Amino acid sequence: MNKIYLCAGNKGGTGKSMLATALIDAFLQRGVEPLLIETDDANPDVFKAHSERVQCAALSLDEADGWIEMVNSLDKTRGVPVVVNTAARNSTGVARYGQTLKSTLGELGRTMVTLWVINRQRDSLELLADYLDAMPAGADHQVHVVRNGYFGSAEKFQLYNGSQLKQRIEEAGGLTLDFPDLADRVADQMATQRLTIQGAFKEMPLGHRAELIRWRDEAFKVLGQVMT
């Protein structure tokens, strides 16, 4: 339970925040309270939804100071899993300062897991290739690709499915995961009211709750593959 989970994608609208929300909930279902580090200062919905439920920190990874503060936060919370919700524009910060984090993983006694959320567009893959150049996979860093079911079934991700990038990820020990789609009316209410999954069960009508339970169970199974 000493891992850092980066919910990444380097572009807006791929589903990073929903993935982070599901990952936090999956830890809570296991009786483990993670630390949330929110780096999306333009749209900190995950932070605002969870700030009263789990430990939270809000940082900007556009500058060196944010990376320094993140390492210090990780040092203070050893033994606690960490969920990092990344901002859409963080590729420049990763390229410049990512080694600040990566170089300290050994001393922190932590490993890093990147969950890279993709849609069906080419730039998702191009940004992933750039990320792998800046933060290569290795013994201390696993990279998994998450096909977001909101954009269609796994078979529709043709660019990724037939890519050398997929082969590169899987040869390095990474997985290709299929994150379930949540009905729009349920997802929209969660986003609008900034609800946690547990909070949504208290606020939503029965039909919404039934759909949320279905999605939550599927998400838990998918994320369980990387929560070791």
Q: Where is each model-derived feature located?
A:
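Walker A (P-loop) phosphate-binding loop of P-loop NTPases
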Residues: 12-13
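Residue-level signal for alpha-helix termini/capping positions
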Residues: 28, 75-76, 106, 136
